[in-house]
Amino acid sequence: MAAVETRVCETDGCSSEAKLQCPTCIKLGIQGSYFCSQECFKGSWATHKLLHKKAKDEKAKREVSSWTVEGDINTDPWAGYRYTGKLRPHYPLMPTRPVPSYIQRPDYADHPLGMSESEQALKGTSQIKLLSSEDIEGMRLVCRLAREVLDVAAGMIKPGVTTEEIDHAVHLACIARNCYPSPLNYYNFPKSCCTSVNEVICHGIPDRRPLQEGDIVNVDITLYRNGYHGDLNETFFVGEVDDGARKLVQTTYECLMQAIDAVKPGVRYRELGNIIQKHAQANGFSVVRSYCGHGIHKLFHTAPNVPHYAKNKAVGVMKSGHVFTIEPMICEGGWQDETWPDGWTAVTRDGKRSAQFEHTLLVTDTGCEILTRRLDSARPHFMSQF
């Protein structure tokens, strides 16, 4: 606590002279908050800390209030590229959004190539980290916050809203929770979340295309807080969708949950792909092979590797204390994919739709804990859109 000129204590019911100011208020530039003692400061903390959140929100809004994009929208930025489906990018993208300096950042956040040196140091290893009780609490917190941010995005899904607007809201929601949006600058990814529409399998870059009636869109959120990452995604309906979209999204969610039901100590990671592919194929769908679930904790992506297709060669056996994601990508047509010239947007080669759901899971002694579960409902958002 820093000593300042005499003021009156801000604690309700206390009129003592106050010479102590909250250090966080000083850092954020909040004026007029003084306390007479550490006891009054601690006693007022539950209400006083709300000033910090308000100040951070206002600062973030000021930082983005002047952002504009001028000029016409370009829906064909890569001359000669043959798109696999009807979706087109809408360029130019908005400028990269800044993250305030008071937010803790992962090691890749300011790297010119977005490289994570901590991940690179462990590249190729199959050793799976057993999380300590402290690690687990860190993961529970960041996963709960990631869920809150995805729920913010879910409330925006409707025709006419752009994925750029969703990304903007996600960015601000991360900052309001003292979190860094993990995708931002990860190997130079330019946005704070991934938004994958229709034939986009994953890693779609938010842009100025308005969502259209009948679209399906996946929003993939990862937050970084206190040294830990929390990761989840859901696929949503945009307005009224056809029966094919409903079946695809429902089946994809069922694939995820059937795999989660199998998670417990002693199960081989390779077994999850058998479960997922069996259910997908039974419903006439295919499973993407190029992208997998992964270990996650202090590293965004690490061991284990968790393929979603059958007869895979994944290494490792589940143990209590492992944390990883399951995130099956299920397609209407073939599983083959290709990548747009932006280097990120993965699309189905045949242009047919793809859906995805993801949870971060903690293996427990008897099964698993879904760290990114909804706290207000056991249902994913799309079930409320029927």
Swiss-Prot record:
Q: Which GO terms describe its molecular function?
A: aminopeptidase activity; initiator methionyl aminopeptidase activity; metalloaminopeptidase activity; metalloexopeptidase activity; zinc ion binding
One GO cellular component from the entry? cytosol
What's its top-level EC category? hydrolase
Which positions does the record annotate as the modified residue N-acetylalanine?
A: 2
| Cofactor(s) this protein cannot do without | Zn(2+); Co(2+); Mn(2+); Fe(2+)
Which GO biological-process labels does this protein carry?
Answer: platelet aggregation; protein maturation; proteolysis; regulation of translation
E.C. code: 3.4.11.18
Residues given in the record as Zn(2+) 3 binding sites = 220, 231, 358
Q: What is its main location?
A: cytoplasm
In terms of superkingdom, the source organism counts as: Eukaryota
Which keywords has UniProt assigned to this entry?
Acetylation, Aminopeptidase, Cytoplasm, Hydrolase, Metal-binding, Protease, Zinc, Zinc-finger
Q: Which PROSITE patterns does UniProt cross-reference here? A: MAP_1, ZF_C6H2
- Cofactor: binding details: Binds 2 divalent metal cations per subunit. Has a high-affinity and a low affinity metal-binding site. The true nature of the physiological cofactor is under debate. The enzyme is active with zinc, cobalt, manganese or divalent iron ions. Has high activity with zinc; zinc cofactor is transferred into the active site region by the ZNG1 zinc chaperone.
Q: Which catalysed reactions does the entry list for this protein?
A: Release of N-terminal amino acids, preferentially methionine, from peptides and arylamides
Start and end residues of each C6H2-type zinc finger? 6-59
Q: Which residues bind a protein?
A: 203, 301
Q: Which InterPro entries match?
A: Creatinase/aminopeptidase-like (IPR036005), Pept_M24 (IPR000994), Pept_M24_MAP (IPR001714), Pept_M24A_MAP1 (IPR002467), Zfn-C6H2 (IPR031615)
Residue sites binding Zn(2+) 4 per the record: 231, 294, 327, 358
**Entry's Pfam families?**
Peptidase_M24 (PF00557), zf-C6H2 (PF15801)
Xref: Gene3D superfamilies: Creatinase/methionine aminopeptidase superfamily
Where in the cell? Cytoplasm
Residue positions annotated to bind Zn(2+) 1 are 9, 14, 36, 40
> Where do the annotations place Zn(2+) 2 binding?
22, 25, 48, 52
- Give the family, as the similarity comment puts it: Belongs to the peptidase M24A family. Methionine aminopeptidase type 1 subfamily.
**Subunit details for this protein?**
Associates with the 60S ribosomal subunit of the 80S translational complex.
| Stated name of the protein | Methionine aminopeptidase 1
Species of provenance: Homo sapiens (Human)
Taxonomic path: Eukaryota, Metazoa, Chordata, Craniata, Vertebrata
Gene that encodes the chain: METAP1
